[in-house]
From Swiss-Prot:
UniProt cofactor(s): Mg(2+)
Disulfide bonds: none
Binding sites annotated in the UniProt record for Mg(2+): D176, E202, D225
Record's protein name: L-Ala-D/L-Glu epimerase
PROSITE patterns on file: MR_MLE_1, MR_MLE_2
Cofactor note: Binds 1 Mg(2+) ion per subunit.
Native species: Escherichia coli (strain K12)
UniProt-recorded Gene Ontology molecular function terms: L-Ala-D/L-Glu epimerase activity; metal ion binding; racemase and epimerase activity; racemase and epimerase activity, acting on amino acids and derivatives
Family note: Belongs to the mandelate racemase/muconate lactonizing enzyme family.
Entry annotated with the keyword Isomerase: yes
Quaternary structure (record): Monomer.
Role description: Catalyzes the epimerization of L-Ala-D-Glu to L-Ala-L-Glu and has a role in the recycling of the murein peptide, of which L-Ala-D-Glu is a component. Is also able to catalyze the reverse reaction and the epimerization of all the L-Ala-X dipeptides, except L-Ala-L-Arg, L-Ala-L-Lys and L-Ala-L-Pro. Is also active with L-Gly-L-Glu, L-Phe-L-Glu, and L-Ser-L-Glu, but not with L-Glu-L-Glu, L-Lys-L-Glu, L-Pro-L-Glu, L-Lys-L-Ala, or D-Ala-D-Ala.
Amino acid sequence: MRTVKVFEEAWPLHTPFVIARGSRSEARVVVVELEEEGIKGTGECTPYPRYGESDASVMAQIMSVVPQLEKGLTREELQKILPAGAARNALDCALWDLAARRQQQSLADLIGITLPETVITAQTVVIGTPDQMANSASTLWQAGAKLLKVKLDNHLISERMVAIRTAVPDATLIVDANESWRAEGLAARCQLLADLGVAMLEQPLPAQDDAALENFIHPLPICADESCHTRSNLKALKGRYEMVNIKLDKTGGLTEALALATEARAQGFSLMLGCMLCTSRAISAALPLVPQVSFADLDGPTWLAVDVEPALQFTTGELHL
């Protein structure tokens, strides 16, 4: 018999996380613990209001399948009974973790993947004044970060970006607008970013406005985040985006994430691996995707005042495995 525990946790941040759609001071996560024959498997998710999720709705979704879980629900069956999203993610990752622990293997070994000893991860520069953002970028660079992800909204774009690039002339920069821009003026903004040597622009437009990217000539790659959840989205992204950001909370777990990675690459997309504000538990579950991606943005746990134990080993801009 398999037992199931489901609970919420709130992890305070050491610094407010400010993006185009608001500011957060804590990471709220939902955790699933499965136990079978004395072995425990754990999965974590971060409910996201942008996708119509709350802690309560995700908990309810998880509780709705507890009877099946107790009877031995498999990962394959899970994909059919819950939609992609945070709830399925926590369950899917708990099932993967349980399987790995039962085999006394790491998750990567179970899947047959070799992980690097060190992963270069983006460090996030959150929204602030141009000077604040430049200072943040400079501090991160001096501490060892080589890849910086700059959060922008619809204001002071050139001022912020010029200040940042002046502060860190040699850093690799990617920019995330979190759907805050509009099609009007996008070409000029893309050119500005390209002129500043920005490596990639993530989700400039609201997902429902993606048609504006059709036949849009742009001088740097554009990555789909809010527009890409599962393999079912890929057809609509073709010709509009060059890259997709895979997050387990969007795919509904590692099972669909691995399938999405394979299919996206087969269709010519580059990959980014992202995360929500989360603990090391959530990052550990996503690690098997690392060898396939061009950019890893896994700094969620580094925003926490205290991480879960045992925590992954982060230094500024790097994750050590």
